[in-house]
């Protein structure tokens, strides 16, 4: 027995030591719910506090309820490892996690701060991960906050509920709710995380009145939502959107009755009564979610979202703050149309099927005939109808209905060769590839043969983002000048971010105005 206990003690000590930062020593922060112990890295000068609870675990009676204020804890809570990530399928290979497994108990956030003892009122970045509201986690290497913290910014990533666990709506849940609606739990988690940052970030040297929210894909859609939401909009000082807005056709919020009906039909498919369904285990629910493959949309719940985003922006009710946004030059590849060879005739058939009476006008705007030009045209059409138009509409709404500066980019840097020496198609920058550039994390993301060009582009994009987070203006530090846009300009300035970044007049806005005539009538 003694031998066993000694072995167990050695293994335990070894595991603790392996989890510790070899260059670190303990640091402490006092937040509203208690004392946290994090790590100070003496090589970087950055403090990290990982796995901080910002709400009670949404389990048991708190499943499918809005986030509840975190309980006080006694003593010192260790904040040195990432908390569990939300329950989710394995979706995309570029999601590389450092979190401690998966759990419904997932409402944790992470803080990287450069603050020294005398520092206070540092600018703050709160970053929402992407993943279609069905996957993702704040521990992913590409979202790491250390590089941006070295720029004098307090960085936070926040976990939120996903898929069935985060967006399930049902009439019975709505009856129980104090605001008589259901769904949107993941977005409510984000809003609660933002409120936690507002209330506690001073403990990490951050300025609660200088919080910029940002995100990519579903994180960008979430950023647009919180600019509009009455629960969130007063807590932010700026917003950055990378590829996506919660505007038709990119996952626009649906009426509560429609979301509730999706929930009713899902429960019916499972063969359980509603009462039985509520009591199922995490594993049982996850199995049913995988089996039935239902998407649970954002909801117009009258609480987090009283109206659609266009309606809120047109009424000038959104956060009146500086906005920096953009998208990538090939968000969706030509493969969206099927297998090679691509032909103009095949493309025209797809356009006519999709655009119906508007097909002739669409084909004039998407005019590539053959070869690489045709591939770019196919990519443009697929990308625009996926999330480029919605991001442009967000841009257009804010410049029209705010006196705050708006900055727009087009990220165009091609991927380098991968570790096998294979080069991707040379038609543009694909979806999500800019994240590690913008946040300065190339060195943490494996699988690519990064070059000096990549590092240069990363320094430029990170520099623009850091300047914007600090001042509401991306310009400075000898970066190429980035003009703000005017409300009525049909060819507004766009910062093309590439090996040689430069501002150019927008060339493709006629496409977005065309799509606006189709999509804006259905908000």
Predicted features and spans:
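Bacterial Sec-dependent N-terminal signal peptides
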Residues: 1-23
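Non-catalytic accessory segments of hydrolases
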Residues: 20-184, 208, 448-461, 469-479, ...
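Extracellular structured ligand-interaction cores
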Residues: 35, 104-108, 123, 152-153, ...
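Serine-hydrolase-like catalytic core of hydrolytic proteins
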Residues: 91-274, 303-306, 312-337
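Surface-exposed helix-capping loop/turn segments at secondary-structure junctions
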Residues: 113-122, 201-210, 270-275, 396-407, ...
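Substrate-gating cap/lid region and adjacent catalytic-acid/histidine neighborhood
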Residues: 238, 246-247, 276-452, 464, ...
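Mature extracytoplasmic/periplasmic domains
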Residues: 422, 475-504
């Amino acid at each position: 027995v003694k031998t066993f206990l000694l072995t167990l003690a050695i293994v335990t000590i070894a595991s603790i030591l392996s989890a510790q930062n070899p260059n670190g020593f303990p640091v402490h922060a006092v937040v509203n719910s208690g004392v946290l112990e994090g790590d100070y890295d003496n090589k970087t000068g950055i403090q990290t506090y990982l796995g901080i609870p910002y709400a009670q675990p949404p389990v048991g009676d708190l499943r499918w309820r809005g986030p509840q204020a975190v309980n006080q804890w006694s003593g010192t809570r260790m904040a040195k490892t990432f908390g569990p990530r939300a329950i989710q399928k394995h979706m995309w290979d570029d999601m590389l996690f450092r979190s401690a497994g998966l759990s419904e108990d997932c409402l944790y956030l992470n803080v990287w701060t450069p603050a020294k003892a005398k520092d206070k009122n540092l600018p703050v970045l709160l970053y929402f991960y992407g993943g279609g509201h069905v996957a993702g986690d704040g521990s992913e290497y590409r979202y790491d906050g250390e590089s941006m913290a070295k720029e004098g910014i307090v960085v936070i990533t926040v976990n939120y509920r996903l898929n069935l666990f985060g967006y399930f709506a049902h009439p019975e849940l709505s009856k129980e709710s104090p605001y008589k609606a259901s769904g949107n739990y993941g977005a409510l988690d984000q809003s609660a995380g933002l409120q936690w940052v507002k209330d506690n970030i001073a403990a990490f040297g951050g300025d609660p009145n200088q919080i910029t929210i940002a995100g990519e894909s579903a994180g960008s859609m979430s950023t647009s939502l919180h600019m509009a939401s009455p629960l969130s909009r007063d807590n932010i000082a700026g917003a950055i959107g990378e590829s996506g807005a919660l505007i038709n056709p990119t996952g626009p919020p649906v009426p509560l009755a429609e979301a509730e009906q999706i929930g009713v039909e899902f429960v019916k498919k499972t063969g359980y009564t509603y009462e039985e369904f509520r009591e199922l285990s995490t594993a049982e629910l996850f199995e049913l979610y995988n089996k039935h493959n239902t998407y649970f949309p954002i909801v117009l719940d009258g609480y987090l979202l009283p109206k659609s985003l266009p309606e809120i922006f047109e009424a000038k009710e959104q956060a009146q703050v500086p906005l920096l946004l953009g998208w990538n030059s090939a968000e969706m590849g030509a493969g969206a149309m099927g297998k090679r060879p691509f032909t103009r005739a095949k493309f025209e058939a797809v356009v006519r099927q999709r655009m119906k009476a508007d097909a002739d006008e669409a084909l004039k705007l998407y005019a590539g005939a053959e070869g690489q030009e045709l591939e770019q045209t196919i990519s443009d059409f697929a990308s625009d109808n996926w999330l480029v138009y919605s991001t442009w509409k967000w841009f257009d709404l804010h410049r029209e209905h705010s006196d705050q500066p708006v900055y727009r980019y087009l990220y165009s840097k091609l991927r380098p060769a991968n570790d096998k020496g294979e080069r991707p198609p040379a038609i543009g920058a694909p979806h999500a590839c800019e994240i590690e550039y913008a946040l300065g994390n190339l060195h943490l993301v494996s699988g690519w043969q990064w070059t000096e060009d990549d590092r240069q582009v990363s320094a430029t994009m990170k520099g623009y983002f850091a300047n914007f987070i600090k001042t509401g203006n991306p310009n400075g530090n000898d970066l190429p000048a980035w003009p703000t846009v005017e409300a009525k300009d049909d060819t507004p300035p766009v910062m093309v971010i590439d090996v040689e970044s430069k501002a150019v007049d927008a060339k493709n806005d006629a496409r977005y105005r065309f799509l606006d005539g189709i999509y804006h009538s259905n908000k």
